[in-house]
Amino acid sequence: MTFAEEKTYKYIRYNHSKFCCVDVLEILPYLSCLTTSDQDRLRASYKQLGNQGTLWELFNTLQRRPGWVEVFIRALRICELPGLAEQVTRVYQSYLPPGASLHSLDPLQSPRIPTTVSEPSAFAAGHTIPDSGFQDKPGYPKPVQDTQPPKSPVENSEEPPQANFGAIPRMSGDSLISSPNPPALSPQPSREHPEQEPELGGPSTANVDSVPIATYGPVSPTVSFQPLPRIAPRTNLSPGVTVSALSAKTTLSSSSTGSAFAKGAGDQAKAATCVSTKEGVPTNSVTTSSVPSIKPVPVNTMSSKLPISTKSTAATPSTVPTNIAPSKLPINSVYTGIVPSKVTASVAKASASTMPPERNNKQAKETLEAPATVVTTGSSLTRPDISSRSLHSGPELSKPGVLVSQVDNEPFSACSMDLAISPSTSLGSEPNHGPEENEYSSFRIQVDKSPSVDLLGSPEPLATQQSPEEEEPCASSVSWAKWLGATSALLAAFLAVMLYRSRHLAQ
């Protein structure tokens, strides 16, 4: 705020009673130096405090804006308050530096009305906004829409390339305003876009300068939005494990009665193998997750009697198998890609034959109740279950149904050196008065009188609390006896004196 503006504000503050005739709601639209938030706040204050309470806040808000005096004088003249306008003009000119003069203070014909709803508008190329914030013409021309269909690339090639001599920034409400310093853009026809193909695996960039922008209004969506053609399909670079991801159809055949088909297309493939057994054992299903990968992995399954293996038709077979324990043993999930299983069909068959029939029946019942085993192959695998190795230990398999536990019958022996206790030298010959961490002080209590029978039945604190209560009646009885004796003595003396006087008067 300049010196002249400060003096003018002090004049308005000292002569505030002269400006009480100003209507806040009437003058607000003509104060272009105020922001939209200032006007909204003043209107809200007008509803709560009225015109007089809001007028003081109006002047406080005005004096924070540069050039507010000239705007205020112009607003006073528009609101038909020429007397106040002349007073403010005279005070303001008196404090201006020599040689400085006021700007044109003629009232505008059309005031600036704050717009609450933004409407789409398009200005002419040579149209500019005045510095004072007013608009000479309040009317807004309608945007020109291009309803013609887009021309073919052949027709575009026949036309000469159009060059944009001014950058037209996009404003809110789809309005176009020319920038004061337009940069020169390199003209290129739009037919060069189909020739530019995006690189595989890289970001596709479009040349912004090659798109001609119409100067007469916004372009229709059919012309402005034209997707570029894509030649090669998008490739997926995420690692993982999949079963025949590039093949269109893959057939998995098994040597037993069960068969399954798997079809893979694009980035995902799923394979499922269903195996049925002759003994009525539930079907073991193997599901391969649809995680994309480069190396195919075959899946091997074994039934209760005969091993059944399904081989993939991929070009490069893998040496890492996925095995499942036979149905005679407890079902455990075996994970692929960490440690290959060494249990073959012959070993599984031999272990199943050596087991007693009772255990076989129990295991058959357990496998009937157990859910289907699902083996999932993916990029991130966990460690195999260690509890499955403990099934092949010697003493546990030799004694089925019996838990063998080894108990050490030897007693525990230890010495005092094993105990972490700090040594204490309190019993030594030399006196040591320093504090010790684990040293405890002890004292001896000697009782000369043995406890009575009454004290054993009742706690000691109750006895100590009852003793004063018993002593109080004794003290009160002694005091009453003293008072009674003194009173009787006085009464006897009084009677003796009365008898003596009566005898003396009788004589």
From Swiss-Prot:
Pfam families in UniProt: CARD_2
Region spans: Disordered: 123-238, 250-326, 350-401, 423-474
Region (Interaction with TRAF6): 153-158, 435-440
Mitochondrial intermembrane topology ranges: 501-507
Chief place of localization: mitochondrion
Subunit annotation: Self-associates and polymerizes (via CARD domains) to form 400 nM long three-stranded helical filaments on mitochondria, filament nucleation requires interaction with RIGI whose CARD domains act as a template for filament assembly. Interacts with RIGI, IFIH1/MDA5, TRAF2, TRAF6 and C1QBP. May interact with FADD, RIPK1, CHUK and IKBKB. Interacts (when phosphorylated) with IRF3; following activation and phosphorylation on the pLxIS motif by TBK1, recruits IRF3. Interacts with NLRX1. Interaction with NLRX1 requires the CARD domain. Interacts with PSMA7. Interacts with TRAFD1.
Name of the protein in question: Mitochondrial antiviral-signaling protein
Record organism: Rattus norvegicus
Lineage of producing organism: Eukaryota, Metazoa, Chordata, Craniata, Vertebrata
